[in-house]
Amino acid sequence: MPSITQDIQRCAQHLRDGQLVAMPTETVYGLAADARQEDAVHQVFSLKGRPSTNPLIVHLEEASQASQWAAEITPQAQRLMAAFWPGPLTLVLPARDEVLRSVTAGQNSVALRVPAHPMARELLHAFGSGLVAPSANRYMSISPTSAEHVAQQFEHDALLILDGGRCRVGLESSIVSLLPGDCPRLLRRGMLGRMRLQDVLAQPLQDSDGAVRAPGQHHRHYAPTTPALGFTQVPTAALDSQQNGWIWCGAAHASQGPAINLGADPDHYAAGFYAALYQLDALDLQRIYIQIPTHQEAWAAVHDRLARACQTLS
């Protein structure tokens, strides 16, 4: 059974002992392990059921620690670090030779982030080194935004969970690749949008070239067990069934089944999206219908998660 705590020192010692700790960040809860202990890193892959070809993000307390993991920190990287760290931005940089191959999935790059959540930073300070921390859920399942979500995912495992409350951002970090010989690339959409990143870089961000350099790039991801269907035109016939759940983004229609309205503000919607999926997925429904928000840049990360969580979009 999982154990939920707010004892930072207990969690830090647990990590030093090579064990796993679920820790809060401002994006989602992460399944943390010592990034320099091979056995601990393998435990992360095993517990999540995550393929070893999927690289991990190393979480750091301060930007100054990035040089311990990255072989080169370009002026572009320095500008992004200064602008957005601590915060929901991951940078993919050339890896130092000593970084574990299990962390990088055998690649010559490493993904780094400095989280903004105060308890994550306290834990990183107490631990004293980098932590890998992919989302604290079974592979491809809904990412957790509360300690209770993590406990649901690992209800039969003796996992220590550091309770830092609800995650403020609610969607995984934006990921930018800055590798030598390649243009800057936006590998994963987050609530830190393309335009803000480009403004700091002073150049365009290209999309991924298809190589899996970072988490969250697989097509099917972040998905509930209940079939999820995205819609723009309301499927009115489905409103009459108590076995259909609904997630709305503004003006909602009356329905017989349970409904959650996350509103028309993208930041508020993102912060509550995974929690809404957890809530409806627990009700043994036939389907979850999700209203697709407007196609604007502010909603880009939400659209990305909808495309990966839903079986169909219409």
Please identify what each model-predicted range represents.
Residues M1-S314:
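Active-site-adjacent structural elements in enzyme catalytic cores
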